[in-house]
């Protein structure tokens, strides 16, 4: 009846956990929520972040200038023991370089940033021992060093282009079975980065469909059906210092699963 909408639970966008503390991000603020009383208090404001981006001292010399943020909705607080929010933003160089940026709201300054190559970076894996960030774009794996430099871990294709397009680096393998939820693993001292290399060239395409487009689009996916040929996975070791990669000699990868 007329009272229906008063009884419907209201959603609260932007909720996340900062350690054991519940926080909420919105356009202009990030707020801490008292879980007993529901009272909110401001942790950081958009104005403070943009002031640090515009006039604050950057930890590294950059080629361009970071653009101001329009919202804090996409910011995150990944570490419960640190007063740091992370977000991505572009600089003012056409077509725009994308950065992963860390802002310390207790010090009110930018404390770290990474230049991310290309569009759609994901699978971020930070190593506090060496200050590097591993991430993927498409099928490729990168390591971003602090400041204005990133290096590709997997070598650029020089041989079979068709085969290499079906090889995935640095992502979860085996369809996320066996508890595999990521594809990069830093060594204890940050000297090396272990990563999965998944060759899917022998796997048949499964006709997935993207229904979010105006007209549905075919987006084939490499999906090993039961009883059919599966992909082959090997483990690479990337040396951060010299940029060289070796692969573990673990025998024939056919129907083997590394966890």
Annotate each predicted stretch with a short phrase.
Residues 1-259:
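Beta-propeller folds
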């Amino acid at each position: 009846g007329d009272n229906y909408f008063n009884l419907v639970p209201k959603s609260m966008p932007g909720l996340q956990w900062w350690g054991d503390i519940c926080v909420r991000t919105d356009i202009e603020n990030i707020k801490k929520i008292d879980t007993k009383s529901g009272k909110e208090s401001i942790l950081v404001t958009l104005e403070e972040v943009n002031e640090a981006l515009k006039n604050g001292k950057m930890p590294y010399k950059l080629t361009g200038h970071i653009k101001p943020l329009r919202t804090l909705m996409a910011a995150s607080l990944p570490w419960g023991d640190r007063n740091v929010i992370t977000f991505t933003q572009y600089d003012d160089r056409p077509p725009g370089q994308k950065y992963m940026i860390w802002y310390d709201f207790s010090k009110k300054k930018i404390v770290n940033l990474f230049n991310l190559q290309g569009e759609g970076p994901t699978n971020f894996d930070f190593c506090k021992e060496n200050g590097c960030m591993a991430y993927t774009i498409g099928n490729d794996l990168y390591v971003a060093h602090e400041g204005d430099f990133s290096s590709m871990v997997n070598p650029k294709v020089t041989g079979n282009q068709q085969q290499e397009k079906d090889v995935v680096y640095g992502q979860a393998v085996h369809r996320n079975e066996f508890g595999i939820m990521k594809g990069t693993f830093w060594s204890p001292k940050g000297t090396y980065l272990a990563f999965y290399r998944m060759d899917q060239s022998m796997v048949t395409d499964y006709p997935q469909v993207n229904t979010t487009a105006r007209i549905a689009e075919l987006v084939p996916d490499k999906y090993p059906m039961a009883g059919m040929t599966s992909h082959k996975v090997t483990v690479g070791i990337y040396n951060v210092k010299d940029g060289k990669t070796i692969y573990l000699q673990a025998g024939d990868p056919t129907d083997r699963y590394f966890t």
